[in-house]
């Protein structure tokens, strides 16, 4: 198959993925357009490329996964609900770089933190061909956020915590939103909105993420 045919096939698969997301209830057209724009197959292992546009999480090494497309779209939708713009975004758990690429089409800046150095290197290699000038990758402990770049209008956490790290709440700008999966065996999405020094929490659907761990590797 030629490169052009391969790209055409991937484009059709991506369009089917987006239509499936719409059928599953995703209504944020901006999020859907971002998902359509970013080639997910570039972020998965070559042997799993045939599953790149399935609605499933896939292993990316180091006991980590690339989130299923529905969850990526849903978390972005919740951050943007009410016509809100993402602004400056902090992503905790960069993984293979896919979600940072999607966020880059909707945000002014994306700071993506990853605690596992070889995985961060993989994300950097995956993102390089896309030439995204507003994405910055950082090897750091995600539970501590990224204080040197704070505050952030949006924070998105791609790992499940037992509770919301105070550091992340402190780095949220007034009027900002934080989306994070919370729980152990049973997890759910939690949306936190900052109003001055008050943090309002809203719970959403059940999800399954790898755990949020402290430290770096």
UniProtKB/Swiss-Prot annotation:
It comes from the Bacteria. Gene3D superfamilies: Vaccinia Virus protein VP39. InterPro entries: PCMT, SAM-dependent_MTases_sf. One of its GO terms (biological process) is protein modification process. The active site is at residue 67. Its EC number is 2.1.1.77. It comes from Azoarcus sp. (strain BH72). This is Protein-L-isoaspartate O-methyltransferase.
